[in-house]
């Protein structure tokens, strides 16, 4: 669920997902096309691809189960589809933490007209 994704971003990356990643580059936020502009935008591209591979549940609307063990987020639950959503979100939040290029604010509120290149395959 997108609200859980926001929570994981805060837990793992230590930042608000909506504020820092909701309107960034060509892939962070709604939609996505063109080539990722930097490492942070690539995190969003990979997350979009991950959601695109989920079948049998809705990555944006379905809630999943996770826990924290020694400060590490662990995806759980019996539903493999929902666990896959959790893994997509966990990996993206970790990617945001490890690639803090969002400080390059030339990509904040980046115009979609600058994202016209052919998209890379997932």
Swiss-Prot record:
Tissue specificity = Expressed by the venom gland.
Q: Which UniProt keywords apply?
A: Calcium, Disulfide bond, Hydrolase, Lipid degradation, Lipid metabolism, Metal-binding, Secreted, Toxin
UniProt PTM: Contains 7 disulfide bonds.
List required co-factors: Ca(2+)
The residues listed in the UniProt record as binding Ca(2+), with positions renumbered to this chain, are 27, 29, 31, 48
Q: Between which residues do disulfide bridges form?
A: 26-115, 28-44, 43-95, 49-122, 50-88, 57-81, 75-86
Q: What is its EC number?
A: 3.1.1.4
Q: Which residues cross the membrane?
A: none
Q: Which residues form the active site?
A: 47, 89
Q: Which GO terms describe its cellular component?
A: extracellular region
What would be one Pfam family of this protein?
Phospholip_A2_1
Q: What does this protein do?
A: Snake venom phospholipase A2 (PLA2) that displays low systemic toxicity and causes severe symptoms only at very high concentrations (15 mg/kg). Has neither coagulant nor anticoagulant activity. PLA2 catalyzes the calcium-dependent hydrolysis of the 2-acyl groups in 3-sn-phosphoglycerides.
- Record-given protein name: Acidic phospholipase A2
> Which species is listed as the source?
Bothrops ammodytoides
* Lineage, top ranks: Eukaryota, Metazoa, Chordata, Craniata, Vertebrata
């Amino acid at each position: 669920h997108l609200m859980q994704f926001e929570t994981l971003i805060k837990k793992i990356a230590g930042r608000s997902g909506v504020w820092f990643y909701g309107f960034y580059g060509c892939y962070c936020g709604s939609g996505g096309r063109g080539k990722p502009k930097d490492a942070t935008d690539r995190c969003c591209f990979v997350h979009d691809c991950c959601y695109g591979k989920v079948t049998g549940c809705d990555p944006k609307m379905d809630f999943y189960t996770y826990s924290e063990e020694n400060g590490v987020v662990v995806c759980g639950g019996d539903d493999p589809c929902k666990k896959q959503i959790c893994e997509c979100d966990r990996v993206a939040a970790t990617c945001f933490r490890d690639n803090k290029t969002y400080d390059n604010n030339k990509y904040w509120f980046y115009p979609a007209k600058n994202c016209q290149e052919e998209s890379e395959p997932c």
